[in-house]
Amino acid sequence: MLRVKGLRVEVEGHEVLHDISLHLPVGEVHALLGPNGSGKTTFIMAIMGFERYKVTRGRILFKGEDVTHLPLYERARRGMGLAFQRPPVVRGVKTRQLVEMCARVEDVDVDAIARELHCEGFLDRDVNLGFSGGEMKRSELVQL
């Protein structure tokens, strides 16, 4: 599903990742571990297409398609997503509002997805405000 080949990444003109390769087949779960400052976040942000993280060499393939030079929103449309370790609280924005905004790209039933992930009880609360760790993760899954 995800293959990274010989990736080199620069941040603000400095090469921070050199010749990184990875293969994550469908149905497998992997963990990316390393000490602080080893490039884990840089690697993930580059894979997702955040502009600050410039891929200078290598390829990123998602479901067999080369997405290396696609913008973040196009990668998201193809099904790529990211869950944060500590997602931000967004006061004044209900989880339902955020999910419905994301759902406009595709025709999806927000309530059906919320039921499937057992999170319909917090759709009308501010995003991540007072959420338990598990609620935050389920909220992120609904948003993806």
Locations of the language-model features?
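Q-loop/switch helix immediately C-terminal to the Walker
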Residues: 86, 92-109
